[in-house]
Amino acid sequence: MAFSMAACGSTGSSSDSGSSAASGSTAKTEEKGEPYTVTMVLQGSQQQDEERIEEKINEILEPELNAKLDIVVLPWASASQQLQLMLSGDEKIDLLYTNATTAVQYMHSGQIMDMSELIDKYGTNLKDIYGEDIAKTNQIDGFVYGVPNQIERGSIPAIFMRKDLVEKYNINTDEIKEPKDMEKVFETVQAGEPDMTMLFSSNNSDTPLSRLSRADGLGDANTGALMDQTNSTTVENYFASDWYKETATMLHDWYQKGYISKDAGTNTENWRTVCKAGNLFSLFFAYHPGTPVEFQSSTGYEFEIVPFYDQPIINSSSYGGIIFSVAQNSENPEKAMQVLDYIYGSPEVMNLLNWGEEGTDYVVEDEENGIINYPDGVTADNAGYSFNCGWELPNQFIAYKWDGSDPQLWDKMQEFNASGIESKALGFVFDLSLIHISEPT
C-alpha cells in the first residue's frame, strides 16, 4: 500500500496544547536565590532566534522552578564528536539527548548519572506517562542511564519517494511490494534526472541496509542479533545471515549502477539537508503516522510512502532509541531533573522548544485540533525559530501539529504503538563492557 504525504510539521496536539499545566515536580518552588540554568544539549539545525525562545521559556521556568534553560544545538554532522568532547572536559552540561547504546558507553565512562533516585523524587510527569517500570526501563543493574521520549514505539521499514518525481515519471507504487522492486523505479527516474542521487546513504550508520533491517540488534547489531525477533531468542551472526547477504548484494549492485552516491562512504550530511537542496529522490526510512508531517515540513517536498510490512515491531530499542540523560558534569542534577520532568508535562514549553513563539514563528489556525502554520510572510527559509524535531524533545504528544497534519495524529500514534508486535527481547540492552578481548600470545 502507498501513503501520499501532503502535510507540514512534526508534532501533535493534546486538547490543552495552549496551556502550561504540569504537576508533581512542576509545582511552584519556594526556593530563593539565583535561579539555576539548566543546559540542555540537542542535535539539529541552528536557530537564528534561539535566545528569544530561551527568554520566553525562562519566563515560565523561573517563577515555577527557580530555573532557566540554556539550549545548545549541535549540528547533525559533528554532534557525536562535539558531545563527547563536552562530556570528557569540564564543560557544563545538565541534560543531553542520546540513545541507549551510547548512554551505556557514557555510563561506563562515568560521564552520566544514575537517574533512579531523581525519577523517584522528581519524575512525577514521567511516571504518570509511563508508569515507574517503563520510566526506569533504560537501566543496567539498577543504574538508570536515561528516560524515554514520548514517540512512536515501533516502526515499519518503507521507501520514501519524492511525490513530484513519482508523478512526473508515472511510477505505479502498487507494483512496489519489497525493496528489490525499487530497481526499475531507480532506472526510470535516473534516466530523466542523471545528476540526482536515487537512494540516500551516509557513513554514520544511516545506511539503506540499517534502515531495512527487521532484526533486533539488542543495542549493538555488530555483536549479534535476533533475526526472527518476534518468535525466537536465538542470537545469530548478523553479518552471516541470509538476509544480510541478499540485501548487501542488492545494495552493492545499486551502488555500482550509480543509484547510491559514490561518496556514501564519506558523506556526513543528514538526509534532510541533501533532500532540501533538491538532490535526492528517495530513502529507506521507518514509517509511522508522524513521518508524513515531519518529512515535508523539514524538506519542503511531499513524499510517496510505500511500507514493506503491515505491523510495527516493538523491540529492545523502542524505549531506548531516543532518551534524555543527566550528565555527570551537572552542577545541580536535582534541578535538571525538575526541569526535564516539567517539560514532559508542559505543552507551553514543548511548543516553544519545537515551534517557537506564537504570533512570531507560528499562528494557531485551529485551536480545537491544535493546528498551526507560519504567519503571513514567514516561511521555512526565513523563520527565526523552527526546530521542528518534536521526536527529539521529551513529549511531542502534547504539542501543536503543523498545518496539513491529521487532527487525530496522536491518537493514531497511540493506536500504531498498540498494534506493534513485541520482540522476545523487549527491554534488553547488551552491555558490551562485559566482553573482554584477549590479545593473542
Regions found by a protein language model. Give the residues of each.
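Extracytoplasmic/secretory soluble proteins
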Residues: 2-438
